[in-house]
């Protein structure tokens, strides 16, 4: 539907690309000393407006990987970061728009 929101499969490759971009940008803009990685995409929608715009609801979790100034990690590296023990894990539910 032009201009309207359409549900998308959370496993769709384009949704996964948008999610990877969202995680990298979230970490780049976050003042937290550690990286957050994707636990899962909860919901995904898209809108066709001069390209594809994605609306994502994602669960993120804080990792043990500390950020190093001038050496940002890429999505695949972030996803390989270890997690703290279950009781010490910090999870966030975040909404992202990727265009």
Curated annotation (Swiss-Prot):
Site positions (Reactive site): 3
Residues annotated as domain Cystatin: 3-99
Motif (Secondary area of contact): 47-51
Calcium recorded as keyword: no
Function: Inhibits various C1 cysteine proteases including cathepsin L (Ki is 0.1 nM), papain (Ki is 0.19 nM), cathepsin S (Ki is 1.2 nM), and cathepsin B (Ki is 2.5 nM). This protein has no toxic activity and its function in the venom is unknown. It may play a role as housekeeping or regulatory protein.
GO CC entries: extracellular exosome
Keywords of the record: Disulfide bond, Protease inhibitor, Secreted, Thiol protease inhibitor
Tissue: Expressed by the venom gland.
Miscellaneous comment in the UniProt entry for this protein: Negative results: does not inhibit calpain.
Name of this chain's protein: Cystatin
GO molecular function: cysteine-type endopeptidase inhibitor activity
UniProt organism field: Naja atra
Disulfide bonds: 65-81
Subcellular location: Secreted
Homology family: Belongs to the cystatin family.
SMART domains recorded: CY
Principal cellular location given in the protein's record: secreted
Pfam families: Cystatin
């Amino acid at each position: 539907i032009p201009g309207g929101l359409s549900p998308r499969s959370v496993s769709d490759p384009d949704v996964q690309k948008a999610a990877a971009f969202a995680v990298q940008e979230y970490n780049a803009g976050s003042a937290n000393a550690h990286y957050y990685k994707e636990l899962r995409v909860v919901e995904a929608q898209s809108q066709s407006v001069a390209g594809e715009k994605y609306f994502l609801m994602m669960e993120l979790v804080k990792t043990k990987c500390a950020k190093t100034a001038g050496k940002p990690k890429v999505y695949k590296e972030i996803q390989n970061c270890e997690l703290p023990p279950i009781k010490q894990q910090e999870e966030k539910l975040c909404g992202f728009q990727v265009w």
